[in-house]
């Protein structure tokens, strides 16, 4: 199984990066091949998610807030790639409402 974590380093608390690596290690223990990619500018999350879907990755996890989630959703539209959310943003309204 192949997956990607799209991480917004400007979202949420500074210690989220450490937690992100812990999540990644747990996924790897369960047989996932994971890459972590960071966003730098607006639109990166959508582009990175679309690239993962086009590459045939099984899942994309969003590590960020509502804006990052929205971009990844847009990048995965019409794909068969599963999306997961690691809510590390400030508000995380999307994750709370789910």
Describe each region flagged by the PLM.
Residues 2-98:
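Small-residue-rich beta-alpha loop regions that form the catalytic core of phosphotransfer
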């Amino acid at each position: 199984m192949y997956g990607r974590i799209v991480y917004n380093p400007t979202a949420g608390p500074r210690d989220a990066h450490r937690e992100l690596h812990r999540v990644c290690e747990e996924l790897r223990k369960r047989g996932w091949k994971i890459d972590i990619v960071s966003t730098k500018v607006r639109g990166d999350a959508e582009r990175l998610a679309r690239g993962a879907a086009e590459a045939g990755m099984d899942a994309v996890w969003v590590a960020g807030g509502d804006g990052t989630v929205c971009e990844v959703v847009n990048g995965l539209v019409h794909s068969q790639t599963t999306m997961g959310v690691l809510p590390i943003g400030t508000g995380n309204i999307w994750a709370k409402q789910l």
